Structures are given as C-alpha cells and as structure tokens.
Amino acid sequence: MPDLSLERACGGRVAGVDEVGRGPLAGPVVAAAVVIDAGRADPALLARLDDSKKLSAALRQRLATALLADPGVEVGLGEASVAEIDRINILQATFLAMGRALAKLAPPVDLALVDGNRLPPLPCPGQAVVRGDGLSLSIAAASIVAKVHRDAAMATLAQALPGYGWERNAGYGTAEHLAALDRLGATPHHRASFAPVREALARSALPGHKCVTALTFS
C-alpha cells in the first residue's frame, strides 16, 4: 500500500503527479498534482488511497470528492487537448498536462514525484517513480483525481456524441468504440494521430462513408 515515506524522505513541499488518458482514441490527456499535509489531512481518507486502477469506479468517485474537500490536500489539474496531442504527440502532450497541473499549485512545490520512468520538463525539480501510484500516497491521490476528472469529462462528451460508448469506455479502443468509429466515423474529439482514427478518417473519405469531422462541438 502507498504511504508518505517518499514525501518525508524528500522533505519540503512535495507533490505527487500522475496522468490518465495516454491510450484512448478520443478525449484529452489529464494530469493531477497533489500535495498532502499529513498533519491536516484526514487519516481515514489517506488509509483508503491506492492506485486508481485497483479501485472500483464508485470508490474512486467517493475518494476524489473527499480529496477535493479535505483541507489538508491540495490539488492541481491540467489537461492537454486533442489538438495538442495530434500536434506534438501524446508523450509531449502528457508532459504538458503535468506541467499545467503543477502550475495550479500555489505556492510552487519544492519537488514533484512523477509516476513512471521518465521525467518531463517541469516548473520545479522532479523525481520519476516507477509504479509510484502503489508507493506514494500523493501519487495515488493524483491518479484517483485525474481518473475521475477525465471519466466525467468523457461522460459529458458522450451526451453530445452518443453512440461511441464514451460514458463506459472513456475513449479507449474497446470493441464497442472501434465498431462505432467504423459505423459513425471520427469526431473532432478523436485523436487523428492514432492509427485506428487515422484509418477511420481515410475510410470516411471514400464514397458512401459517413464523416462527422466537419461538425464542431462545445
């Protein structure tokens, strides 16, 4: 289970950073940066935190709500849009979202613990932590908040663009999503730089195929 050992060892004001949404075919990539003040945060809440992938959707939602309301927890959220993903690639867009999340924290942190094995350019010193969401409470908290935020955003998009199942698959390339992409065509919220979307766009240019890429959605 994650704890605050890494944060305490580093000293100072430390944020855990994690992202969600690198793999989906649609929607933004989202990052969260979280600072936990162990002296003020609810210990019962901290005891329930874990890697977001190990938690049910309902529990993630409850924990994210509690984290955002806890006076001992600070949260910064950052996104990179589909247009940015297609322009600079998903890795660089992920790094951009992480930097934006950290920039939301004030005052700035002394160190960022970033989940993964690569350290992006950041507005502060950083340390990459492999499987950090299972080691660091602040990274685990960031993974939960980022996941819940992005899932909610995709559910909202699903209301405007029904048929792709985004409220269930969050834009990932499930069988349902791929079938809808073939049947309905790509939308402005699809990542044109990803192969399945690129192939769908090529098919949509053929006579008799539907294309919705000319539509705009707010």
Swiss-Prot record:
Keywords: Cytoplasm, Endonuclease, Hydrolase, Manganese, Metal-binding, Nuclease. It catalyses: Endonucleolytic cleavage to 5'-phosphomonoester. Pfam families: RNase_HII. CDD domains: RNase_HII_bacteria_HII_like. Its EC number is 3.1.26.4. InterPro entries: RNase_HII, RNase_HII/HIII, RNase_HII/HIII_dom, RNaseH-like_sf, RNaseH_sf. A divalent metal cation binds at D18, E19, D115. Manganese or magnesium. Binds 1 divalent metal ion per monomer in the absence of substrate. May bind a second metal ion after substrate binding. It is found in: Cytoplasm. Residues 12-206 form the RNase H type-2 domain. Its cofactor is Mn(2+); Mg(2+). Endonuclease that specifically degrades the RNA of RNA-DNA hybrids. Belongs to the RNase HII family. This is Ribonuclease HII. It comes from Rhodospirillum rubrum (strain ATCC 11170 / ATH 1.1.1 / DSM 467 / LMG 4362 / NCIMB 8255 / S1).
